[in-house]
Every structure is written in structure tokens, then in C-alpha cells.
Amino acid sequence: METKQIQETINMVEEEHLDIRTVTMGISLLDTIAGDPQQTAKNIYKKVTTYAKDLIKVAEQIEREYGIPITNKRISVTPIALIAGHATPDDMLYYAHALDDAAKAVGVDFIGGYSALVQKGFANGDLALIKSLPRALTETDLVMSSVNIGSTKAGINLDAIKLMGETVKGISEKSDTANAKLVIFANAVEDNPFMAGAFHGVSEADVVINVGVSGPGVVKRALEKVKGESIQVVAETVKKTAFKITRVGQMVGALAAERLGVEFGIVDLSLAPTPARGDSVAEVLEEIGLEQVGTHGTTAALMLLNDAVKKGGVMASQRVGGLSGAFIPVSEDAGMIDAAKEGTLTLSKLEAMTAVCSVGLDMIAIPGDTSATTISAMIADEAAIGVQNNKTTAVRILPTLGTKVGDMVDYGGLLGTAPVMPVVEKSSADFINRGGHIPAPIHSFKN
């Protein structure tokens, strides 16, 4: 590397909030299945703690040696519903607690994979897991969950969407924050290192390391140097910056995998904000030329940003995967919080933005009296965007009891704060209650 490039990397870390957002170890649990849930839970605990015992130590070594912060160390596992074919909802809690205990034993921040894949229908394990979610997510601290309810190839499972709306509502009655640990996907990916949607897909190797980079602050600082330039210069600047960010992620991931004696999976290029000022995707969009995120032009600016990040990243790593785009979680992004508070950023605009970025309606507070069918309808709209456009979309929505539109809700830490946003009050219940399955789009038939 040239001296100038080395100095740029140092500045990115010290001044522009560049970090490795997560080093996530993916672990297959297919070989832990035993005759009864309690024994399977013991096997899960043993495998996770065996492989992940040095994850924290190795990540901290790399941090010290290279001066690059690694914010989170996490684990993802095989979707638990796949290994729980005969389980009841009560049985599922053995698995949830085994995951939670294992995560605490090795010291990671979160463990993902308390998940089900129901885009085409339910198996017994899927239903048991979904029915267990209100207890599983409120009785554990570090367990993250996801449910995939649609795909471009399979279509959309409207029965699952109805059930997930009821589940989100049920969770909100037990906890204000537990829904932050649940993502409802369309077109979920198998190698996502980010929470809460991470799980270890069945086509993955036994144990892998996946890395999620971040750097909204780095991109914003780079764009500050090209004020007034053409939009082509903006795109080129983002591409070059994403290249540098991804190189750092590639190096950290390869080192971590080598030292842990496991395979290196992918680098996820996603720009993931935090509530800290200067670490905001909204501020990047505003630097491109918007007075405030949510105004007209926001979707176009986000499309440009997302595309340029991907183009720069794929040149820097042969192993790009995960979600790889820009995240727009309202409560976790200082600029999004401001725009939502002022009414510039609405649910409708966020839905439009999800058509061109990762991932969806994310970390959005809505009134606690929002009906289950309205929540289901929001999930259905997001799924439709993902399924029709062959991309990942998701919903992580937070109905908060006792709140009304305009109230501020503090979720703490990286989860941030969010204003309660209005939802349309007209009912979608008759649509959701039809149930059944929305067929796959015509362009999914490619064989």
C-alpha cells in the first residue's frame, strides 16, 4: 500500500467512525439432533461453546494488532425449526435457553438463528417455533429470531404473515423491546452476519466466519470533499470509499477465520448506522443534496448510494455476500430519528426506500394499539416489494403499549430512540383474513 492509502485508513478509523460492525461465526447444528429436545439442547450448547470459545479472544487480538475496532462478536446457527421437527412450543424453549446460555458462556453480543423458513408452508417445527416466540424472546437476553415468509421462487405465505402479525402483537404485550430481536423476511439470505436476521443456512460449511463492515461516517466525509460536483463524481467517490472499507473487512475476516481454524465466508458491504452523530446513512443522503432525508429525491439518492457501495465492494473482495447495501433503521440512525420526528420521513416513504436498498421497515415504533392485521398488512407490503423485485426485504416493527403518535421511545444502547410514527387507520383485516398463498411472480419461472 502507498503511504497515502495507509494514512487514509488510519483517518477512516480515528476520525470517521470506520469499524468492523460484526465478526459473526456461523455454526451448523444439523449434527446436534438427538432423540429428545433436552438432549438436543445440550448438544447445541456443547457445539456452540466448543467452536466459539476463542472468538472473542481472536477478535480482540486483531483489534489490538491492527487498530481496527470490531464492535460486535456474534454467532449465527442453523434455523432452529429445522432441527426441531417433533418439538412442541414448550420444547422450543429448551433450544432458546441453550442458545442464550451458550452465547453468554463464550461472551458474544448476540446469537441468531432462532428462525423458521415458511415461504411455502409450515412444518411442525416451524409452527412450534413461531408459537414459542413471545416467551422465547422475553425469557432470553441474547437470542435473535427471524422468520422468512416469502421468496421470489415460492411466492408469499399469507397464512404465515397473519400469524406473524399476531405474534408481533403478542410479543409487544410482554415487552417493549423484544420485537427488536425479531425480523420477518422475504428472500432471506443464508450468510447474513447482521442481527437480528442472521442464521446459518443449510448450504453453508460446518463453521464459517462472516464479516459485516460499516462506514456511513467514512462515506459522508468523502462526499464532503466533492460538494457541488456532478452526480457521476458522487457515485465514483462512494465506489472508491466502499472499496477501501471492504478491503479492511476482507483482511479482518480472513485473519479471524485462519486463527480460529474455520472457513472464511463472506464480507457483507452494508452501511449500518448507529445512533451516534456522524455515523448515519441519513446524513450521507443529505450530503448528496437532500435538505432532510424523506423529502422528494430520497429514493433516487438511496438507489445511487446502494449501487455505488455494491460496485466498489465487489471489486475489493471475491467473497461478497449477506445483504450488502444500506440499512435504514429509524431508531438506530440519528438523521432518520430527526426526520421522522419532524414528519419529513413517513412510513410510506420508508416503504418506497426499501425497494432500492437493504433491508426494509426497520426499527420503527408504531402506536401500541395498532391491530395485528395492520401489522400483517405492513409485512405483506414489504414482502411484495421483495418478491416482485427479487431482493431481500424485511420488517422489524415495534408496537409500544401506551404510546401515541409523536411520543419518543428509548430502546437503549445501539437500539437507539424512535418517535412513534402514524399508521393508516383504515382496516386491511378482510385481506389478511383471506389467508392462503400469494403465487410467485411470473418472472420467477426461469428453468
UniProtKB/Swiss-Prot annotation:
S-S bonds: none
A Pfam entry, by short name: DUF711
CDD domains: RNR_PFL_like_DUF711 (cd08025)
InterPro entries: UPF0210
Family: Belongs to the UPF0210 family.
Subunit structure: Homodimer.
Protein name: UPF0210 protein LEUM_1180
Organism: Leuconostoc mesenteroides subsp. mesenteroides (strain ATCC 8293 / DSM 20343 / BCRC 11652 / CCM 1803 / JCM 6124 / NCDO 523 / NBRC 100496 / NCIMB 8023 / NCTC 12954 / NRRL B-1118 / 37Y)
